[in-house]
C-alpha cells in the first residue's frame, strides 16, 4: 500500500509501515514516503514514545525480523571519559548502575533498582546536569517525571552532582577558556580522554571533521541585538555560546562518531553474510539517537543480535580506554524489538 502527501503537506496515515527499502546512508522511507535520514528531515523518528502504536506499526517484511541495539548511555560515557572523571569512567567500565550511584549520594543511603523513585532522581540528574543545567530546569524535569521536589532540594542535588563530578564541571571552564583563545586568534588542544585540536572558529574531531563557530566574538556589554558573552553566526543570526554548551557540542559529536562507527561495522558484517541477495534482506535500516536497527531473515535474528552486541562493544581506535556497552532486542515490529 502506498500513500501520498497532500498538497497541504498533511500526512495520510497508512495502517502498515514497511522498513525494507532503506539504509544507513540513505533516507528512510515508509511505504514509499520519505521520513528519515541520518542527518534529519522534515519528519523523523527520533521521539517515538516507547510502547506507542507508531513503533508497533514499523514491521519487518515477511520472513524477516527486526534487531535493534542501542549504545548504552553513550553521551554520559563519552562525557566522563573526555573530561577525565575517572571514578565515573570506572563505574561504567565495571557495569555499575551510575544512576543508583548518584542517587545514593543524594539520599545518603544505598539505592538500588528496586528504589524506583530515588533511582529516577539519580537518572534525571545524571542525564540532565552534565552540560551546566541549573536547579530550575532540573526541578521541571523531575516534576514531569512525577517527582515534585522543593527549590532547596533541587539546588542541593545540583551541588552534589557538581562536587561529585568535578572534572566535568571543570571542563565547562576549560571550554570557556577555549572560546577566549579562539577569539584572541590562538590555537590549542582540549580534553583529557582525547586531545582535540582547535584553532580560531573550529575544533577538529577524531574523524577529521570540524565543529565550526563562524565569526565567533565576545561582547562585553549587551545591546538591542546581542546578549553579553560569546556568540557566533548561524545563518543570518547570532547564536550564544558558552563553555558548558561547547562541551555539549563536543560530546554529542564524539558520541555520534562512536555510534556511526558501530553502525559501519554492523553493515560490513551483514554484507559479508550475503547482504540483500536471493530474496533475503540483511541491512541496516534505521538509526535513532544511539540506536542501530537492522532487518534480517527470521532464522538469523538471534545470531545477528549477538553480532550487533559484539560490534557495539568494540572500543574506538581513537578512544581505546572509553568503556562502551549496549543492549539489544528482537521483534517482528520495531516496538517489539525495543
Kindly give the residue locations of the regions a language model identified.
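Polymerase palm active-site segment centered on the conserved acidic dipeptide of motif C
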Residues: 153-187, 299-338
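Short, surface-exposed acidic
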Residues: 107-119, 146-158, 320
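Short Gly/Ser/Thr- and Asp/Glu-enriched loop/turn motifs at secondary-structure junctions
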Residues: 120-122, 285-291, 321-323
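Helix-rich, typically C-terminal accessory recognition domains appended to large enzymatic cores
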Residues: 133-138, 259, 326
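Catalytic palm subdomain of template-directed nucleic-acid polymerases
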Residues: 79, 130, 137-150, 157, ...
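Short alpha-helical scaffolding segments that buttress acidic/His motifs in well-ordered protein cores
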Residues: 75-79, 102, 121-129, 157-161, ...
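Amphipathic, charged-and-aliphatic alpha-helical interface segments
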Residues: 83, 113-132
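Acidic, glycine-rich two-metal-ion catalytic cores of nucleic acid-processing enzymes
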Residues: 1-111, 174-291, 306-312
Amino acid at each position: 500500500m502506498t500513500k501520498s502527501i497532500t498538497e497541504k503537506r498533511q500526512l495520510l496515515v497508512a495502517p502498515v509501515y514497511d522498513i525494507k527499502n532503506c539504509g544507513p546512508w540513505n533516507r528512510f522511507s515508509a511505504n514509499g514516503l520519505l521520513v528519515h535520514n541520518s542527518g534529519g528531515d522534515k519528519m523523523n523518528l527520533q521521539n517515538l514514545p516507547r510502547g506507542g502504536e507508531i513503533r508497533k506499526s514499523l514491521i519487518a517484511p515477511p520472513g524477516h525480523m527486526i534487531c535493534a541495539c542501542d549504545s548504552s548511555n553513550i553521551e554520559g560515557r563519552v562525557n566522563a571519559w573526555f573530561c577525565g572523571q575517572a571514578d565515573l569512567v570506572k563505574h561504567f567500565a565495571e557495569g555499575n548502575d551510575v544512576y543508583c550511584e548518584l542517587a545514593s549520594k543524594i539520599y545518603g543511603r544505598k539505592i538500588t533498582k528496586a528504589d524506583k523513585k530515588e533511582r529516577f532522581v539519580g537518572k534525571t540528574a545524571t542525564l540532565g546536569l552534565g552540560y551546566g543545567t541549573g536547579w530550575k530546569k532540573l526541578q521541571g524535569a523531575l516534576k514531569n517525571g512525577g517527582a515534585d521536589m522543593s527549590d532547596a532540594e533541587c539546588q542541593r542535588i545540583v551541588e552534589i552532582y557538581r562536587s561529585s563530578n568535578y572534572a566535568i564541571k571543570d571542563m565547562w571552564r576549560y571550554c570557556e577558556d577555549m572560546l577566549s583563545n579562539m577569539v584572541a586568534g590562538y590555537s590549542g588542544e582540549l580534553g583529557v580522554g582525547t586531545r582535540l585540536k582547535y584553532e580560531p572558529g573550529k575544533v577538529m574531531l577524531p574523524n577529521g571533521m570540524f565543529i565550526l563557530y563562524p565569526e565567533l566574538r565576545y561582547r562585553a556589554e549587551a545591546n538591542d541585538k546581542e546578549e553579553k558573552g560569546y556568540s557566533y553566526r548561524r545563518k543570518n543570526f547570532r547564536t550564544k555560546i558558552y563553555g558548558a554548551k561547547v562541551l555539549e557540542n563536543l560530546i554529542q559529536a564524539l558520541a555520534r562518531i562512536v555510534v556511526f562507527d558501530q553502525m559501519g561495522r554492523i553493515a560490513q558484517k551483514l554484507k559479508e553474510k550475503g547482504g540483500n541477495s536471493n530474496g533475503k534482506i540483511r541491512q541496516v535500516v534505521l538509526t535513532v539517537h544511539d540506536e542501530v536497527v537492522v532487518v534480517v531473515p527470521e532464522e538469523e535474528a538471534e545470531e545477528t543480535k549477538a553480532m550487533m552486541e559484539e560490534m557495539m562493544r568494540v572500543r574506538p581506535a581513537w578512544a581505546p580506554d572509553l568503556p562502551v556497552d549496549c543492549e539489544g532486542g528482537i521483534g517482528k515490529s520495531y516496538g517489539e524489538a525495543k
